Amino acid sequence: MLADLGLIGTIGEDDEVPVEPESDSGDEEEEGPIVLGRRQKALGKNRSADFNPDFVFTEKEGTYDGSWALADVMSQLKKKRAATTLDEKIEKVRKKRKTEDKEAKSGKLEKEKEAKEGSEPKEQEDLQENDEEGSEDEASETDYSSADENILTKADTLKVKDRKKKKKKGQEAGGFFEDASQYDENLSFQDMNLSRPLLKAITAMGFKQPTPIQKACIPVGLLGKDICACAATGTGKTAAFALPVLERLIYKPRQAPVTRVLVLVPTRELGIQVHSVTRQLAQFCNITTCLAVGGLDVKSQEAALRAAPDILIATPGRLIDHLHNCPSFHLSSIEVLILDEADRMLDEYFEEQMKEIIRMCSHHRQTMLFSATMTDEVKDLASVSLKNPVRIFVNSNTDVAPFLRQEFIRIRPNREGDREAIVAALLTRTFTDHVMLFTQTKKQAHRMHILLGLMGLQVGELHGNLSQTQRLEALRRFKDEQIDILVATDVAARGLDIEGVKTVINFTMPNTIKHYVHRVGRTARAGRAGRSVSLVGEDERKMLKEIVKAAKAPVKARILPQDVILKFRDKIEKMEKDVYAVLQLEAEEKEMQQSEAQINTAKRLLEKGKEAVVQEPERSWFQTKEERKKEKIAKALQEFDLALRGKKKRKKFMKDAKKKGEMTAEERSQFEILKAQMFAERLAKRNRRAKRARAMPEEEPVRGPAKKQKQGKKSVFDEELTNTSKKALKQYRAGPSFEERKQLGLPHQRRGGNFKSKSRYKRRK
């Protein structure tokens, strides 16, 4: 009756309830990461069916979490059609490979059975038992035999690298700068005369004591002076410029709705991070912030800019776009200009854009330059745009974090192809989680993602070829510990504060020491410990020597057993087909998306007509297309980049690349090193150029006549006779010194000649 009405009946005591059998877990299991046999069995024993393995605590460790600010940014992302992710493609290829291996194995066993049909029945029984055992252990079977396991469990050896001790030359304080590197070490946030809303936000974020850069910068920033600050990465530079700016905005409320503070950052991810920190510091104030970076929705940004936020955080490209295409937006009311990671902002790739932005800014402004390394470009800008600036050097330009342990792995000559195998061995055996792997090129980063993914590791990638959605998603997953390894290019090397990064691995040494400082600065942040492991070839030894010389703590040399490297090299060679299969899947999907887009455009034109389709006006830029093209060609690092000149050259280059075929492991590594060397070569050429002559004094102090170095004493005949100074007379009376006697072969004088022994005072008998 109840069932007819669609209601659920009550179960009586006598009613029999059918119990569904428990689902078998004997189906195909996903191949886990390469874990050695004993460890994997232990993991299997500890698994309990009472808890869902996907369960995650919602509350994270730490005093505050900026996820609410990130969620707001994620909502502005451009919506795109959902496609299969790279991880899904890798998983598909892995499953296919696994089934093929199983089929091959079963075929092999059948052949063995047929071969042994004529053998004794006892042997047949043993074979059957072995087959049953093999089928049971199939799910938990690792890729390695017990012999392989013995090889892979060999420990790496660590040696301390010796360095030649040299006295460091002290930095001279410039005459143009007012030096404020000395600060009160006992200064706290309460002593800085900050407003109550800011102190409340500082407490809410869990900040207890200011860092050295904050102690030095905040009091100077509150005075409204221009600042040129240099401090190591991970020392809290964001709060050092955000707090004085927020205090200024609270103290002096705006009279009209205008944007008063502009913060320029080099990368989108750093912009999102600075925006998140600024919003958290301003959560108890009536101060509005806006984020204008590439990859986010332009229309929503334009609407936010029309509302005239107090603080604008932007990347140079998107800011210029808004300045030329958003009529109501301008920079004439800017009171404070902040350049975060100023050395990157002022390199050759941002040069034209920065000139345009500074030209459009208000002349009456406070300017703050913050960087981990001080370059000539930063000094040039400081001399032109800063008025009586205060220079704050908390750390030396090439100082790494104090609790960073630096390790280096030597790559032998003609062994450049071992880099991938070494990285795979490190990530599988030693550093399994919270790792950032830096590569020189986007192509190599993508390849490493595929390779490590095929090995069963949880990997993500972050570089310029990805869409903004993919970049932020990779960053979010790494922060939330959904992935263990983040493969990135130098786009992630600056300013990003990812909590809990334990290890940074450099696939090749970066372009310059400055880039190295930024890369390894992703770990050992805010007083925590961390480790960096860099692979160094013969061509990169010079940079290694400079790093060892500058290091304060002892530097270690890590040596991996050769057997381990060979095993991983063989494994990677076997995986080449799978890597190619994943790349093919990606290419097919890309072609499908392009075809779909063309079909949709054609449909829209057929349905509405060409005139009915409203096309948005083209967005203007401060350079013409030709000027942009020339600039791109001028800054191309390599000959093949010059293919940008025209279609014919581009086609020819593509054809030549196809003829050559796939690069070997050695060629890939050499290509990475070549890129870094070409950048360093160009940088060296630029540094050799003569400096611009200026009417006003530059930031460098006007040095007096060079002090003559003290030369060794030279014996001159006429000087010795005519010199009547007190010192000369004293030397003349004393006679030749011990060293001079030694050189001349004279008998040595007894030391302490004036001393009278007791024997002289003995009474004569």
From Swiss-Prot:
Instruction: Report the EC number(s), separated by commas if there are several.
Output: 3.6.4.13
Q: Which GO terms describe its cellular component?
A: chromosome; nucleolus
Q: Where is this motif: Q motif?
A: 187-215
Give GO MF terms, alphabetically: ATP binding; ATP hydrolysis activity; RNA binding; RNA helicase activity
One matching Pfam family, short form?
DEAD
Residue ranges, compositional bias (Acidic residues): 43-63, 157-172
Binding-site residues for ATP, renumbered to this chain? 231-238
Q: Where in the cell is it found?
A: Nucleus, Nucleolus; Chromosome
Residue span(s) of domain Helicase ATP-binding: 218-392
Entry keywords, A to Z:
ATP-binding, Chromosome, Helicase, Hydrolase, Nucleotide-binding, Nucleus, Phosphoprotein, Ribosome biogenesis, rRNA processing
Q: Which residues carry this modification: Phosphoserine?
A: 23, 25, 48, 135, 146
Biased-composition ranges, Basic and acidic residues, are 129-156
Q: Which superkingdom?
A: Eukaryota
Instruction: List every stretch annotated Disordered.
Output: 43-83, 111-179
Residues forming the motif Required for interaction with the PEBOW complex are: 55-57
Family (UniProt): Belongs to the DEAD box helicase family. DDX27/DRS1 subfamily.
- UniProt subunit comment: Associates with PeBoW complex, composed of BOP1, PES1 and WDR12. Interacts directly with BOP1 and PES1.
UniProt protein name: Probable ATP-dependent RNA helicase DDX27
Which organism is this entry from? Answer: Homo sapiens
Taxonomy-wise, where does this protein's organism fall, top ranks first? Eukaryota, Metazoa, Chordata, Craniata, Vertebrata
Which gene codes for it?
DDX27
